[in-house]
Design a protein with these regions (language model features):
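Cysteine-centered motifs
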Residues: 19-21
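Bacterial N-terminal signal peptides that target proteins for export
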Residues: 63-72
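Bacterial N-terminal signal peptides
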Residues: 71-80
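Boundary at the C-terminal end of the N-terminal hydrophobic targeting segment
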Residues: 82-88
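Short acidic, glycine-rich surface-loop motifs adjacent to enzyme active sites
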Residues: 165, 270-290
Length: 393
C-alpha cells in the first residue's frame, strides 16, 4: 500500500483533481461500505454510528486488517493532497480578482459613494503601451517584461492611489497565436503590484484590433474586464473609453452608439455630483497638439473628434490622458488638456521608456513624465503649481 501511495503521489496534479472528485462524491460511500464490510452487526447503522463503533473496536469488529488499513490510508491520501489547488487554478483566481475588476461599467476596487467626496490631494501613475512583443516583432518579450517589472518596482515604492495603463497591453491581438503568452506575461508582471494599489487596464488597438468587433472586445474582456467604464477617487470622476471604436466603428457600430449614450449619462451625473475634476482615459489621443489638426494614424478622425470635444468641453472635463503615440505630446482644447504619454515599452521618439505621475489637487492637476531611470524618490503633494507643457518629441 505504501508503494501504491508513492506512485499515486508522483502523478501530482492529476491525482489532486481525482481526489477532489472523490472527496465530494465517492469517498463518503466508500468509507460507509468499508465500515459495513464483513459484519452483520454493522448493517443498518448510520455513518456516524459506524465511525464511532469502529473507532472503539477497530479491525476486531469483523473487518479485515487489510481492508481497514486500506480505508485509513486512502483517507490520509485524500486529506493530504485533495485540497491543494493547482498552479493554473491559482493563476485563474488571480486574473479574475485583479485584472477583471472593471465590470458592469464600473471598477470594483473603489466605493463610489465614499469616493465621490473630495478628501485630500493624491497622485496616480499613468502608463501606456507596455506592448509585450513590440521590440522583436512578436518573437519574444524579454525587454518589455524587464521594463514592466521596473515600473512595478517604482509603483510599489511610491504607492500611488491607483495605476492606470492606457492601452496596447500586448503587441499581438486576440486572434494571433502569441496573444495568450503575452497576456500571461502581463498578468504575471503586474500581479506583483501591491494588492492595495488598484490596477486599471484600458483597451488599445492592439488589444481589440484596429477594426474592433464584438468578438474581439469579448476576448479582451475575458482577460481584462470591461472595455469602457467609470470610477470615482477622492472626489474625482474618472471615465475610461474604448477609443478604438472611435477610431474605426465599422466593425462594431452598436458598441460606439452604446458608449456615446453611456458617456453622456456619466458626464451629466458627474456634474450633478459636483465632481472636483472629470478626467478621461483612453488609448488613442483625440489630437496630438491642435484640436483641429488633420486626420492621421495617431489621432481620432475629425468626424467623431469634433462632436466629442464639444461634449467634453460642455461637461468641463479637466484633461484627457492617452498613449498610442509611443512618445509624449501635449495640446489644449479650450481649458481642457490633451495629454499623450510615452511608452513603458518600445519608444518611437527621443523620450525614454517610462510613465507619467499625475498629482491631483483640489483646484488643479500637475503631471510629469519620467524615464525609468529618472523617477523621483518621493512625491511632494504640497506644491500646487501649474504643469509646464512638455516639449513634443
Amino acid at each position: 500500500m505504501a508503494r501504491q501511495l508513492r506512485q499515486i503521489k508522483a502523478h501530482g496534479g492529476a491525482f489532486q483533481q481525482f481526489c477532489r472528485c472523490v472527496v465530494s462524491r465517492a469517498l463518503p460511500e466508500l468509507v460507509f461500505s468499508v465500515l459495513q464490510e464483513g459484519h452483520q452487526g454493522n448493517k443498518g447503522l448510520s455513518a456516524p454510528q459506524l465511525l464511532h463503533r469502529n473507532h472503539e473496536n477497530g479491525p476486531a469488529n469483523g473487518i479485515s486488517m487489510r481492508t481497514y488499513s486500506s480505508a485509513i490510508l486512502f483517507l490520509i491520501a485524500t486529506t493530504m493532497w485533495a485540497p491543494k489547488a493547482s498552479a493554473a487554478d491559482e493563476v485563474a483566481a488571480e486574473v479574475n480578482g485583479r485584472f477583471k475588476q472593471a465590470t458592469n461599467r464600473t471598477f470594483k476596487a473603489f466605493n463610489q459613494q465614499r469616493e465621490q467626496t473630495w478628501q485630500q490631494p493624491f497622485f496616480f501613475f499613468q502608463l501606456a503601451d507596455t506592448q509585450y512583443g513590440m521590440f522583436t516583432g512578436n518573437k519574444g518579450f524579454e525587454k518589455e517584461a524587464a521594463l514592466a517589472q521596473q515600473a512595478v518596482k517604482h509603483i510599489n515604492r511610491l504607492r500611488p492611489r491607483f495605476v492606470i495603463v492606457c492601452g496596447d497591453l500586448t503587441q499581438a491581438s486576440p486572434e494571433q497565436a502569441r496573444y495568450r503568452a503575452q497576456v500571461a506575461q502581463y498578468h504575471q508582471d503586474f500581479s506583483k503590484v501591491d494588492p492595495e494599489i488598484p490596477l486599471v487596464c484600458v483597451c488599445g488597438n492592439h488589444d481589440i484590433g484596429n477594426r474592433p468587433t464584438p468578438k474581439s472586445i469579448a476576448s479582451y474582456s475575458e482577460n481584462f474586464g470591461d472595455d469602457y467604464f467609470s470610477f470615482w477617487v477622492g472626489g474625482v470622476c474618472n471615465v475610461v473609453l474604448n477609443s478604438s471604436v472611435l477610431k474605426d466603428p465599422t466593425g462594431a457600430p452598436e458598441v460606439l452608439a452604446a458608449q456615446q449614450k453611456w458617456l453622456e449619462q456619466q458626464l451629466r451625473s458627474a456634474k450633478a455630483a459636483k465632481a472636483r475634476h472629470i478626467l478621461l482615459f483612453q488609448h488613442h489621443p483625440l489630437f496630438l497638439t491642435k484640436e483641429n489638426e488633420p486626420d492621421q494614424y495617431f489621432n481620432i478622425p475629425l468626424a467623431r473628434r469634433t462632436p466629442l470635444l464639444d461634449q467634453l468641453k460642455r461637461a468641463d472635463v479637466r484633461a484627457v490622458f492617452a498613449g498610442h503615440y509611443h512618445r509624449n505630446a501635449y495640446g489644449r482644447a479650450g481649458s481642457m488638456e490633451m495629454i499623450t504619454t510615452g511608452p513603458v515599452g518600445k519608444p518611437l521618439g527621443k523620450d525614454a521608456s517610462g510613465f507619467r505621475i499625475v498629482i491631483v489637487h483640489k483646484a488643479n492637476i500637475q503631471h510629469q513624465y519620467y524615464g525609468m531611470d529618472d523617477v523621483p524618490k518621493t512625491i511632494d503633494l504640497t506644491k500646487a503649481t501649474q504643469t509646464v507643457e512638455p516639449t513634443q518629441q
